[in-house]
Amino acid sequence: MTRLTPKQLCRCFWDAIVKTIQHDGIEHAGYLAFLTLLALFPFLVFMVAVIGFLGQGETGAAFITSILQALPGHITSALKPRIVEIISGPPQGLLTISIVGAIWTASSAVEGLRTILNRAYHVATPPAYWLRRSLSILQLLIFTFITVMGMVAVVAVQVFIHHVEDWFGMRLTPENQAYLQNMLLFIFIGVLFIGVSSVYYAIPNIKQRFISVTPGALLVVLGWLGVAYLFTLYLLNFNQVQLIYGSLGGIIAALVFFYVCNMIFIFGAEFNHQLIEALGLRVRQREDVGKSVPTQ
């Protein structure tokens, strides 16, 4: 495989920024931020129903609670009360038709991602709407299953850390406890990296190798961690959101956070495509593997 020089990598980085702007990535990030907020609660309702059916309700609640604790408090303040209500138990009167509606709404976010990623990868002829929508629902179901399995793994590690002293009859020093907490953080980052890579790999209507999507996924995860840290500092020291929007400040802060995170996600896809072009590789559309996707 061709090796890229640091200058070529910087060129790919810059071209990805340019393409993100040219492909309306800034505007699409706002669209995805809205879909993220719109699909969040239906997805949680559906996922709670699934983990309840599997008998893992407490595991799911512990996992979602740990995620809420990891996110900036100003962002989750407006969302947390309803999220806590949902993970405490499915809404009363939840019918089959409601589950179907939740799946449809949550899959809209997947469909939005597909549209944007197809544009980033220059897909000339996307599939028919019914096929795209069917794929979105199927991929949502697969993503839900993988998320549940990831919940079990992460929560199992948390349980191990909290009970290691009782199980093994040993006392952990503060250094050992810090090491185990860092290990849990790295596991969470690893799960996040695999999740982003899987989205880049599975959702766009192209055939590609999994390894080719990992550079952009790595940039996205690092970018998200940096944004979460900087956004927390901003809200703590420059509380303009609450001053301007009042009681709506929490919702607006969440939308802004999702907006920036989605912009980074779109940039990661553009960066992957620039790397593919720099390496002289070609990607092929799934519905017609005999033709290469035209590049621009």
Set out the residue ranges of the language-model regions.
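Membrane-embedded alpha-helices and immediately adjacent juxtamembrane helical segments
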Residues: 1-296
